[in-house]
Amino acid sequence: LMKEFADNDDMPLAGGVPTAPTGYNTDWFNEILNTAPVTEHNITANFGSDKGSSLLSLNYLDQNGIIGEDASFYKRFSTRLNSSYSINDFLSVGANVNYAYIENSGVATGINGYNPISYAYNIDPTTPVYDENSNDTFGYGVSPVPYSRMWNPIAFMDEAPKNKNITQQFFGNVYAEITFIKDLVFRTDFGINHRNFRGRMFAPKFFHSAECKEDNSRVEQSTNANSSWQWENTLRYKKSFGE
């Protein structure tokens, strides 16, 4: 139907490719989607005595994306430590510490329909994934339908910008409680939250058609770090009367 529309409307053709029957019947969703396995490991250890206890946990998650194959993934390593101990009758201490390392990468999805899913919906099945006779488009098949959004989804994923990000985050708190007398308790609590981000984007130059091209390669890098802390001190007195 899309081919007939282009023929009947007598519009200029994308890349100059004729709208004659091609003999192809490409399943574009089958071409762009892939199985995305998920691997996750968890280890938890508990330690304790009559003075207190600690819990240490480790987690590793590795998930591939359903689009982009090796170019799309999410990896995370995280650890957590919770502990509380009574030093003596009037002093107790504790800590809650968390750390995470995240690495993720993916094919740029863009906005306003400029992404592989949108292209797979819109491109006609008569376009082949690859065209060995088309050296000027790097061997990718070009749709005969004259619309800028008729981008070959495989070409888009191969040539579109690739993003790779690394995020590290540390947050936690340590505290101490001092019991001066039976009903009077002082607590000091110090917490911190630190996040560090590094991102990199690479967009290669390419020519897919007159409407789908990038004349220059681009590299963008960004870094961001922020920290915050909070220190709380409270004095609590609790007394019951009339019991």
Show where each model-derived region lies.
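Surface-exposed loop/interface segments of Gram-negative outer-membrane beta-barrel transport/assembly proteins
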Residues: L1-N25, L61, G65-Q169, R187-E243
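A beta-strand signature from Gram-negative outer-membrane beta-barrel systems
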Residues: L1, V38-E40, S53
